[in-house]
């Protein structure tokens, strides 16, 4: 009611092309007195109380509306995508698919330009209902990504059973990618498995040039993280994308010294 919630967005790039191909929407709470509340604090409370359902509906429409505006203004590619995180409470809401449909209609965005991001934990809680909802979303063209992949307990069985289209490699693996052989082997295995299943892969939390070079060597073509861009406000996205699009192929034009 006080309009203290807002969205920021982090660009996702194609490492080989150097293009911004999509964005992830992230929620922020800035109070009237100027202080900020961490999502790690308010999201669990919103989930527990159920208020995450209306908040999530607002965020979904807001994110898609931002994307439609950027496309119309020529800020990003016409096929750029928006990734929106969805909580267990939202996914188990019987009206969720209708909410997604309405947001797509009101924003005039095609379904295949929306990524719904869920964690493996979402599929542990009431798996049959989660499976039904994700299948219905997939049927209308919305794509599903597993966020923080590799940190859960039943990843492989979920990949076989659920309609998953993308794996987002958790930042804990990326942190040690350039310096730890075991981390590199794990990331290589995840990428190879995803490729064999026809799944898209995005590396999260890329913060150093060395990590980006390592991802390029492992043929992971999509990435996001502070090296590329911090989450930015909708108003500053035009200058952010313009700056990123001028860089070109990231590993080649940011050589290691």
Question: Can you say where each PLM-predicted feature lies in the sequence?
Answer:
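Bacterial c-di-GMP phosphodiesterase EAL domain
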Residues: 1-109, 121-122, 135-136, 156, ...
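The catalytic core of metal-dependent phosphodiesterases that act on cyclic dinucleotides
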Residues: 19-22, 101-177, 191-231
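Conserved strand-to-helix beginnings and helix N-cap segments that scaffold or border functional pockets
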Residues: 39, 93-98, 127-131, 156, ...
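Phosphate-coordinating loops and pocket residues in cytosolic domains that bind phosphorylated ligands
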Residues: 44, 93, 161, 179, ...
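Short, contiguous acidic/charged loop-to-helix segments that flank catalytic cores in large enzymes
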Residues: 46, 50, 124-125, 176-182
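Conserved N-terminal phosphate-binding loop of PLP-dependent enzymes in the Aspartate aminotransferase
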Residues: 186
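C-terminal helical cap(s) of enzyme catalytic domains, especially alpha/beta-barrels
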Residues: 216, 232-257
């Amino acid at each position: 009611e006080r309009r203290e919630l807002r969205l920021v967005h982090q660009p996702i790039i194609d490492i080989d092309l150097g293009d911004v191909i999509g964005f992830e929407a992230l929620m922020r709470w800035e109070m009237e007195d100027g202080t900020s509340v961490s999502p790690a604090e308010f999201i669990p409370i919103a989930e527990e109380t159920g208020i995450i359902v209306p908040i999530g509906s607002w965020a979904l429409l807001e994110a898609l509306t931002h994307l439609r505006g950027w496309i119309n203004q020529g800020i990003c590619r016409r096929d750029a995508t928006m990734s929106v995180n969805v909580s267990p409470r939202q996914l188990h809401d019987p009206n969720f698919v209708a909410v997604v449909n309405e947001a797509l209609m009101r924003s005039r965005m095609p379904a295949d330009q929306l990524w719904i991001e869920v964690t493996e934990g979402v599929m542990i809680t009431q798996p049959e209902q989660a499976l039904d909802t994700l299948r219905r979303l997939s049927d209308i063209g919305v794509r599903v990504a597993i966020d923080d992949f590799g940190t859960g307990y039943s990843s492989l069985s979920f990949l076989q059973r659920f309609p998953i289209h993308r794996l987002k490699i958790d930042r804990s693996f990326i942190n040690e990618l350039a310096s730890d052989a075991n981390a590199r082997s794990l990331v290589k295995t995840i990428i190879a498995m995803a490729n064999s299943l026809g799944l898209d892969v995005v590396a999260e939390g890329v913060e150093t040039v060395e990590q980006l070079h390592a991802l390029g060597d492992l043929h992971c073509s999509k990435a996001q993280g502070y090296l590329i861009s911090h989450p930015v406000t909708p108003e500053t996205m035009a200058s952010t994308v313009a700056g990123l699009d001028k860089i070109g192929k990231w590993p080649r034009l940011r050589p290691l010294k």
